[in-house]
Amino acid sequence: GGAGEVRDEPAGDECNGGACLAATIDRYCHVSARWLPPFFAHRSRIVWSKIELVKERSEIEHPAVRAALEMLGIEDGVEIHHDGDLPARSGIGSSSAFAVGLLHALHALKGEFVGPERLAEEATRLEQDLLNEPVGNQDQLTCAFGGLRLITWEPGGTWRADPVTLGPETVRALEERL
């Protein structure tokens, strides 16, 4: 990439190695999930920029929600709400933030604790393999781990997301320039 250019790093066997410095910002993607009681005419309610009331998982319009429910084997009715500080397709990782948040909420709903490594890998699989999005995996890694990270990829696709520690004065100087 050229000066000022940002590109997604390919994951898996396509990766020739590389590194990037990635930081999260103070904008959020709130995702909540609960089991929907069986008293409604619909089986699931998905609330995002629209409200979906569906009887079957296959009727869910939101592709990431439908794929995540299938990926995690969730058949029972659910209610999912998404509120984001940033619009979809903003170009700064909002879709990956949603994928990570959605998977985290669904695992919690199932009573499962899932760490950032697994969340990042599942979000990457969701976006790349199930939704066929032309993305790398640095956004998923950054969203799952948070903070300021040095992400490195080895040939073959293995990766690390190491925290970068800065002193208070450096943090202030960086924040003033962002």
Q: Which positions does each model-derived feature cover?
A:
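A generic structural signal for short, non-catalytic loop/turn and secondary-structure boundary residues
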Residues: E14, T24-D26, F39-A41, G73-E75, ...
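Generic structural motif recognizing short loop/turn segments at the entrances and edges of beta-strands
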Residues: N16-L21, F40-S44, D76-V78, G93, ...
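Short catalytic helix/loop segments, enriched in acidic residues and glycine
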Residues: D13-A33
